[in-house]
Amino acid sequence: FATVDCSEYPKPVCSPEYMPLCGSDSKTYNNKCDFCSAVVESNGTLTLGHFGKC
């Protein structure tokens, strides 16, 4: 079970780096920052599916 530490998020601006993560919602997030922002917005219901594209 893969996890991502989102404790330092949300950040005001995400970098444009591309290191895709697949969320439990089957959506591909561009990077950890984008993913963690979505996790915060979901009140913790969103989890990491796996690293890489969905």
From Swiss-Prot:
Q: Which domain of life is it from?
A: Eukaryota
Q: Give the Gene Ontology MF terms in alphabetical order.
A: serine-type endopeptidase inhibitor activity
Q: Print the keywords alphabetically.
A: Disulfide bond, Glycoprotein, Protease inhibitor, Repeat, Secreted, Serine protease inhibitor
A single Gene Ontology CC term: extracellular region
State the compartments where it is located.
Secreted
Give disulfide pairs as residue numbers.
6-36, 14-33, 22-54
Which residues belong to any copy of the Kazal-like domain? Answer: 4-54
Point out the glycosylated residues in this chain. 43
**Domain comment as written in the entry:** Avian ovomucoid consists of three homologous, tandem Kazal family inhibitory domains.
Q: Which PANTHER family match?
A: OVOMUCOID-LIKE-RELATED (PTHR47729:SF1), SERINE PEPTIDASE INHIBITOR, KAZAL TYPE 2, TANDEM DUPLICATE 1-RELATED (PTHR47729)
Protein name as it appears in the record: Ovomucoid
Q: Which organism is it from?
A: Casuarius bennetti
Source taxonomy lineage?
A: Eukaryota, Metazoa, Chordata, Craniata, Vertebrata
